[in-house]
């Protein structure tokens, strides 16, 4: 495992350096550090997963993304790539601004939107950002609740973990997260692409509006499938059942589990007023 020590100076391909200040967090792919880059605080994602460290294709795609630049302001896009060193590499990005919450915190009710306007603004900003990404010929490939930072007061949305973005039709071996992957990926029929992005986007939008997961109702809760790939295929593949399916009731919400008030109500008049304002503003 290639961890960095506090005070380590990391060389970047643009001829500059960044200096590690502290660890911010870690996950399956690597560790995120706070760094000094050009005299300002930034973040450095440093890979520890061997399949990424040893992938020349992943490194090349990451470098290409840096050179191409961000497709929209909502993306916390890679700013600079580290030269391979100290047994690994990584990339520099902006830090998350204050006032933003992980999308997962909304699902857990640890964060709440101030109003419906902010809630729908988050949805529309995310849609607009991915529309631009797809228009430039990219696909995101691994969209899930861990990719979004949202301001609960305004609904302003930021998109992180953009190292998996690649030209549509090209894949670095990333499949996605259970519950967010399109059925055709779950069933092994295709790799992620812009069309499977649409499915993942729909799941994320449903969660942001209703604060519940669209395929995790009574049927899902009755099936212990954490280590059963075949059962996972049934629950999230072509046999999946929408939690609000009008004809199949086996996966309906469960009282005592699906308690978020948005599950049963979202003001239609508020939605209509917001969408009218959105159209009139000429949001680009």
Regions found by a protein language model. Give the residues of each.
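Conserved C-lobe activation region of Hanks-type protein kinase-like domains
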Residues: 205-271
């Amino acid at each position: 495992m290639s961890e960095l020590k506090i005070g380590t100076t990391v060389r970047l391909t643009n001829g500059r350096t960044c200096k590690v200040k502290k660890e911010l967090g870690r996950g399956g792919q690597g560790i995120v550090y706070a760094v000094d880059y050009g005299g300002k605080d930034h973040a450095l994602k440093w890979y520890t997963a061997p399949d990424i460290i040893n992938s020349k294709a992943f490194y090349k795609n990451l470098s290409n993304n840096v050179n191409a630049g961000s497709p929209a302001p909502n993306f916390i896009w890679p700013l600079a790539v580290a030269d391979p060193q100290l047994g690994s590499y990584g990339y520099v990005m902006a830090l998350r601004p204050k006032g933003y919450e992980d999308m997962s915190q909304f699902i857990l009710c640890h964060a709440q939107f101030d109003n419906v306007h902010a809630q729908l603004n988050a949805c529309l900003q995310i849609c607009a950002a991915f529309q631009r990404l797809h228009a430039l010929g990219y696909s995101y490939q691994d969209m899930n609740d861990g990719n979004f930072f949202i301001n609960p007061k305004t609904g302003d949305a930021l998109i992180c973990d953009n190292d998996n973005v690649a030209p549509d039709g090209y894949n670095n071996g990333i499949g996605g997260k259970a519950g967010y992957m399109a059925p055709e990926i779950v069933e092994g029929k295709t790799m992620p692409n812009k069309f499977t992005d649409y499915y993942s986007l729909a799941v994320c939008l449903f969660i942001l509006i209703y604060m519940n997961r669209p395929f995790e109702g009574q049927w899902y809760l009755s099936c212990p499938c954490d280590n059963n790939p075949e059962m996972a295929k049934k629950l999230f593949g072509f046999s999946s059942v929408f939690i609000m399916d009008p004809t199949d009731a086996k996966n309906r919400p469960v009282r005592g589990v699906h308690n978020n008030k948005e599950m049963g109500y979202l003001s239609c008049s508020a939605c209509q007023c917001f969408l009218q304002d959105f159209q009139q503003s000429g949001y680009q």
